[in-house]
């Protein structure tokens, strides 16, 4: 089963790498997806809609932008969201401790309701969105540069292979 999962990851990675478009456009789509994936909480359909609209606006690949929003998924939010809240609380000057934030998130995850979410309070929400915005920018920028480097390198190697093949064919 583990090999099957690795194979699936490899297939999707190769599809991503082989996507048509300039390295800038592909990297920009990843950056948009990462940013939106951080600042809009999961479970809200707006994450998908906003990522696709921004991708279209910036003339990038909406599919890649949508896929990149999955940086926040049910598994990663268990780590990301408390970190967002902690960093945001430090920026806005709130005294929320990481232990308190983590404890409240665990309670919320085990017994979710909209009332319990609203009862977290405005400081909690404000610290979340400030931290998410900061991390969204950082992760988006990192995602852009890493993706740009990977795609550029892949396209250079691909072009070198094509040139080498043509030279062998012509000689």
Region annotations inferred by a language model:
Residues 1-23:
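Helix-loop-helix hairpins and the membrane-proximal interhelical loops
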Residues 33, 37, 55, 72, ...:
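Membrane-water interface at transmembrane helix exits
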Residues 154-171:
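Short, highly charged, low-complexity non-transmembrane loops/tails of multi-pass membrane proteins
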Residues 39-53, 57-67, 72-84:
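Transmembrane helix boundary and interhelical junction motifs in multipass membrane proteins
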Residues 127-152:
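Transmembrane alpha-helical segments in integral membrane proteins
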Residues 83-112:
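Juxtamembrane non-transmembrane "cap" segments at the membrane-aqueous interface
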Residues 21-44:
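Transmembrane alpha-helical segments and their cytosolic interface motifs
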């Amino acid at each position: 089963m583990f090999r099957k999962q690795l194979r699936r990851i490899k297939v999707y990675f190769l599809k991503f790498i082989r996507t048509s478009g300039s390295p800038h456009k592909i990297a920009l789509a990843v950056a948009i997806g990462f940013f939106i994936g951080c600042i809009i909480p999961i479970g809200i359909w707006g994450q998908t809609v906003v990522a696709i609209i921004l991708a279209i606006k910036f003339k990038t690949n909406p599919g890649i932008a949508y896929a990149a929003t999955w940086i926040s998924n049910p598994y990663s939010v268990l780590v990301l969201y408390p970190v967002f809240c902690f960093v945001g609380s430090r920026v806005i000057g709130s005294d929320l401790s990481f232990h308190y934030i983590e404890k409240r998130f665990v309670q919320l995850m085990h017994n979710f309701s909209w009332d319990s979410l609203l009862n977290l309070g405005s400081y909690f929400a404000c610290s979340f969105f400030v931290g998410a915005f900061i991390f969204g920018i950082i992760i988006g920028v990192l995602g852009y540069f890493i993706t740009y480097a990977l795609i550029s390198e892949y396209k250079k190697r691909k072009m070198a292979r094509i040139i080498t093949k043509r030279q062998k064919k012509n000689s």
